[in-house]
Amino acid sequence: MDLISALEGLVPELEKGLDQASSLEGLEALRVDFLGRKGRIAQIMSRLPSLAPEQRPAVGQTANSVKERCNALFESRKGALKAGREAEALKRFDPSVPGRAPWSGTLHPTTLVMEEICGVFQGLGFDVASGPEVELDYYNFEALNMPPEHPARDMQDTLYITDKVLMRTHTSPVQARTMLHRKPPLAVVVPGKVYRRDSDLTHTPMFHQIEGLMVGQGINMAHLRGTLTAFVRAIFGSDTRVRFRPSFFPFTEPSAEVDMSCCMCGGQGHIDGSPCRVCKTTGWVEILGCGMVDPAVFEAVGYDADVSGFAFGMGVERVTMLKYGIGDLRMFFENDVRFLGQFAR
């Protein structure tokens, strides 16, 4: 059999193979067998040099014609197989099945809790104030009874930009700015980001605080206790117990730490006989710091000596962790949608 006959004989063989091909994968294997670099057409054409020169053009033309016919047969069969696959898929499609709702974003849990806290205090008559995150040393320290070389400055690792400019270490500078521009009576809460040179498993260089201030005539510790007790019970439940412990802050006197009954174990110190990992068996967890505003702070902002007031501050991430039982602070900063999606409203 000469080469032209061999080439022509491949077409009916291919047609038979195509009729038996039932998948795109099988079709591709057949294409490689006939048209591949080492396929059957290539094997026949490898014998072309053995022919006389005058016979080669006819064989070459036949080879090109056979390749074109084979490609046309492949494309036709490929289209038929794809159409069959799509038709089969449509048979399984049920238009009555509800569609999948697109994933919707949500506010970060820190933002949700910050808004909730501000909402509680707004209900108690407080305004919401804000101020710069890049702050002057005067407002961050000196106006809050912490002059240069004051030992209380060692309590905070500060990120300085220049000798007199820094990243605020708390939101209390906004309280000083507010008092310089407003006369009592006043009541404000100040949410925002703060920065400290601290980074480990339980601390981050940037976190969120909410600090509050109330100033007026006759403001005393009873007002402070009533306000913060109402706040804690609004966030954690009406049966939450609250206690105040003596403490020290340079801009309040007297000062106190506020503890609440553990929200994990209900203040029992244990859960089903096992020690509570949140309160470490004490039944109490620290929630915020507070105190009566030091007269030196009022003097720095030009207030009369007959006014009094209280201030308080808390870390929003800590409140969020206690409220939702989150055990790892790093989860707030990893942007894992599996975590964030749990707080969708």
UniProtKB/Swiss-Prot annotation:
Enzyme class, spelled out: ligase
ATP-binding found in the keyword field: yes
Cofactor: Mg(2+)
Record keywords: Aminoacyl-tRNA synthetase, ATP-binding, Cytoplasm, Ligase, Magnesium, Metal-binding, Nucleotide-binding, Protein biosynthesis
Binding sites annotated in the UniProt record for Mg(2+): E253
Catalytic activity of the protein: tRNA(Phe) + L-phenylalanine + ATP = L-phenylalanyl-tRNA(Phe) + AMP + diphosphate + H(+)
GO terms assigned for molecular function: ATP binding; magnesium ion binding; phenylalanine-tRNA ligase activity; tRNA binding
A Pfam family annotated for this UniProt entry: tRNA-synt_2d
PROSITE patterns linked: AA_TRNA_LIGASE_II (PS50862)
Coiled-coil region(s): none
Major place of residence: cytoplasm
Binding note for cofactor: Binds 2 magnesium ions per tetramer.
GO biological process, one term: phenylalanyl-tRNA aminoacylation
E.C. number: 6.1.1.20
Protein's cellular compartments: Cytoplasm
Stored SUPFAM superfamilies: Class II aaRS and biotin synthetases (SSF55681), tRNA-binding arm (SSF46589)
InterPro entries linked to this entry: aa-tRNA-synth_II, aa-tRNA-synth_II/BPL/LPL, Phe-tRNA-synth_IIc_asu, Phe-tRNA_ligase_II_N, Phe_tRNA_ligase_alpha1_bac, Phenylalanyl-tRNA_Synthase, tRNA-bd_arm
Quaternary structure and interacting proteins, as annotated: Tetramer of two alpha and two beta subunits.
PANTHER family per UniProt: PHENYLALANINE--TRNA LIGASE, MITOCHONDRIAL, PHENYLALANYL-TRNA SYNTHETASE
Family the entry assigns: Belongs to the class-II aminoacyl-tRNA synthetase family. Phe-tRNA synthetase alpha subunit type 1 subfamily.
Name this protein carries in UniProt: Phenylalanine--tRNA ligase alpha subunit
Organism: Desulfovibrio desulfuricans (strain ATCC 27774 / DSM 6949 / MB)
